């Protein structure tokens, strides 16, 4: 059996509240070397304010955690197996920290 290293944190409401900054920081601190962070917008991509949520999440990671997080966007399943889809997969595969949410 192949050993896999990593962590998953499942957070409920308030995932970007000040009370949970320490959870994000703990996960980030466990990463050896450079942190390559991605934000998946799929869970909330259907919402009219999805772009504003992306901006707020990027700002949260910048201000609260001093971390640049890059958007890995895939909002519509009709683009499955498109160039957009494979670009999304490539970003995820090259990341060692992934945030997906809220939604």
Where are these regions (language model features)?
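Extended, subdomain-level signal for the structured scaffold at the beginning of enzyme domains
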Residues: 1-103
């Amino acid at each position: 059996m192949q050993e896999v290293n990593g962590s998953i944190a499942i957070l409920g409401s308030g995932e970007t509240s000040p009370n949970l900054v320490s959870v994000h920081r703990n996960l980030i601190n466990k990463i050896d070397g450079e942190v390559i962070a991605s934000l998946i917008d799929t869970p909330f991509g259907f919402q009219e304010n999805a772009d504003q949520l992306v901006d707020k999440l990027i700002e949260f990671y910048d201000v609260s955690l001093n971390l640049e997080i890059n958007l890995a966007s895939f909002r519509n399943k009709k683009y499955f197996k498109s160039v957009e889809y494979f670009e999304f997969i490539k970003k995820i595969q090259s990341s060692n920290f992934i945030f997906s949410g809220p939604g």
